[in-house]
Design a protein with these regions (language model features):
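A conserved regulatory-domain signal marking ACT and ACT-like small-molecule sensing domains
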Residues: 1-100
Length: 100
């Protein structure tokens, strides 16, 4: 499974992304995608999107989400788990399999 998480801090400060990714590292969560997007209501602020391996019910993810929730509340921000979805590894084809 993969899970998507969105995070927005109330105010931007240096080191916020580092701190959030540290929570994932402490819980041995593998991030597969990270993106920042402008927040439409306040263009000077950003929403961080994280994709990770694991289901939202995984205890490791829950622990990291709790730590992130506490961190963003201090800056009057928010976090939202967008959901979990099944994921299947892509098959890599070799030259023999590609021949007609």
């Amino acid at each position: 499974s993969r899970t998507l998480l969105a995070v927005r801090f109330g105010e931007n400060h240096p080191g916020q992304l580092h701190k959030i990714t540290g929570f994932f590292a402490e819980s041995s969560i593998d991030l597969t995608f990270v993106q920042s997007r402008p927040y439409k209501i306040r263009p000077q602020q950003y929403v961080l999107i994280f994709e990770m391996i694991g289901h939202k019910s995984d205890p490791r993810l829950k622990k990291a989400f709790t730590q992130i929730e506490q961190e963003v509340r201090q800056s009057e921000g928010w976090k939202k788990v967008l959901g979990s979805f099944p994921y299947r590894e892509r098959q890599v084809l070799d030259d023999e399999q590609l021949k007609p």
